[in-house]
UniProtKB/Swiss-Prot annotation:
The keyword Hydrolase applies. Changing C107S: 4-fold loss of activity compared to wild-type. It comes from the Archaea. Changing C105S: 3-fold loss of activity compared to wild-type. The keyword Hydrolase applies. The active site is at S156, D251, H281. This is Arylesterase. Signal peptide: none annotated. Belongs to the 'GDXG' lipolytic enzyme family. It catalyses: a phenyl acetate + H2O = a phenol + acetate + H(+); An aryl dialkyl phosphate + H2O = dialkyl phosphate + an aryl alcohol. GO terms for molecular function: aryldialkylphosphatase activity; arylesterase activity. It comes from Saccharolobus solfataricus (Sulfolobus solfataricus). A motif (Involved in the stabilization of the negatively charged intermediate by the formation of the oxyanion hole) lies at residues 82-84.
Length: 306
């Protein structure tokens, strides 16, 4: 279908502003500008309660935010990993999404402020997210959640971390109830139809931020073939948590996300895959669509947690 007029207007304003311009700005300035843009992308809803704390890891204290819904009907938990090409984003940039998700799922949500590249290279972010899941399971009683009802949710690079931690959880015999990778990066694919068609002019440009983000995140080219970076090429995708995979029509990552869903199905993993037409990567420029998609995901997870 045609590009949503609201999204088209957003793209015109976004490219005119030229936020990601390394001839004008230093990286830290770009990080700040993009984070400010993302934080305002969707209006924030009230929730029952939010609580900020830090998880003590072996060498680091990992910030998290715990969201309680206005109305709780189940003791499930959704672990939320934000997007941002592994180099951008924070709890704040997807605070609105966490709030919508908590209220629509009617359960607790924990958003994880994992460490970013280039300060911290792959696989630091993966293990930050995985360790947050382990911490939540170990503290299920205090959190008021069922340790056997934990789902993961993430957008873009967050979707990559969802898929990667699903592999880690399976291999470490840690049960997850569901995985929800939304417009995920699961493989550095430069040859697909969607990658070629939407590689420039649809927000997620291939040179910036995709290629730049990848180069800042990985340690060397060997990481490109590590399943924790490229879950799509993992030899075995069986026995992973059931999946809800969401893609966007005008997104260069669309085809790889749908290929991941197909491989999950082939591997016997119960999988629901749907494409949001008329929208770009992460539904930027359409707060209405972003809200609708998040509410639908929350409703599906609520049903899974029953």
């Amino acid at each position: 279908m045609p590009l949503d007029p609201e999204v088209r207007n957003f793209l015109q304003v976004y490219y005119k502003a030229n936020i990601i311009d390394f001839t004008k700005y230093q990286f830290q300035e770009i990080r700040q500008k993009v984070n400010e843009l993302l934080a305002k992308a969707v209006p924030k809803d009230p929730v029952g309660e939010t609580r900020d704390m830090k998880i003590k890891l072996e060498d680091y204290e990992l910030p998290i935010r715990i969201y309680s819904p206005i109305k709780r009907t189940n003791n499930g938990l959704v672990m939320h990993f934000h997007g941002g090409a592994w180099i951008l984003g924070s709890i704040e940039t997807e605070d609105a999404i966490s709030r919508i998700l908590s209220n629509s799922c009617e359960c607790t949500v924990i958003s994880v402020d994992y460490r970013l590249a280039p300060e911290y290279k792959f696989p630091t972010a993966v293990y930050d997210c995985f360790n947050a899941i382990v911490w939540a399971r170990d503290n299920a009683g205090e959190l008021g959640i069922d340790k056997d009802k934990i789902a993961t949710f993430g957008i873009s690079a967050g979707g990559n971390l969802v898929a990667a931690t699903s592999l880690l959880a399976r291999d470490n015999k840690l049960k997850l109830t569901a995985q929800v990778p939304v417009v995920p990066f699961v493989y550095l694919d430069l040859a697909s139809k969607s990658m070629n068609r939407y590689r420039k002019g649809y927000f997620l440009d291939i040179n910036l931020p995709v290629d730049y983000g990848v180069k800042m995140y990985i340690r060397d080219e060997k990481d490109l073939y590590n399943p924790l970076f490229s879950p799509l090429i993992a030899e075995d995708l069986s026995n992973l948590p059931q999946a809800i995979v969401v893609t966007a029509e005008y997104d260069p990552l669309r085809d790889q996300g749908e290929a991941y869903a197909y491989r999950l199905m082939e591997s016997g993993v119960p999988t629901l895959s749907f494409r949001v037409n008329g929208n770009v990567h992460a539904f930027l420029g359409s707060p209405r669509t972003s809200r609708q998609v998040t509410v639908m995901i929350g409703a599906l997870l609520k049903d899974i947690f029953k």
